[in-house]
């Protein structure tokens, strides 16, 4: 579990060294494939302890974040080229309607993603963090301000940040559950059933954004607002045959069927077709998709 790699070749230098994200990913795969239960208690505990060993305290990061040193060093390697790009972005951001992410923002989002994934995966196998994670954004007024600052015309990224707050709320005794549920009321689109403010440019973005927000609502134990509308939208906008698009699409339909039987027969057929599409992406020689 310490040397889990997602591919046999094609990895970057950093990709060959990172540990936390891939170990967490490996644990999730073990759980999904039923292999987790085949491990003995000592093996399970060792894996959980390994993931929890990444809980660290760094400046500019929330207390007890999950931090892979390789990821930390990558984002904090201040090369001349990197500093120049950041300076240019900051300058361009002065112009109205431009909002380029500087490296520090990208770094914090990366750590947030790894922290959320670690906490969520541990919860999935009935385990928890060794130390309580304390997000920077915990007060209601700060959380509302943060959510308002996100670009909701790109719900696949903003939705990911929303979902992470839902995870943190759940593990901290539902501390901001009502605020997050109320905020989803502001995002939902009555026509598509998805969640955004300004309409994204492509259907795949609308479906992917729905996947992110629906995963957050699942953590909150909250209902999907318009599951029938979302099912109709997905049926009208089938994805291209790419891994992430298919998985996002299937997840959205699956979650909707948990709440309604609307067009259930048609959706179940889509699931069967999607399995065949996913099989086409499998490379036998690489033993992966």
Q: What spans do the regions from the language model cover?
A:
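Helix-loop junctions that connect tandem helical modules in alpha-solenoid scaffolds
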Residues: 12-15, 102-107, 146-155, 194-200, ...
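Extended ligand-binding groove/face enriched in aromatic
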Residues: 38-182, 186-190, 267-273, 277, ...
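Extended alpha-helical scaffolding segments
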Residues: 24-31, 39, 48, 250-289
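Long, repeat-rich segments with strong aromatic
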Residues: 167-266
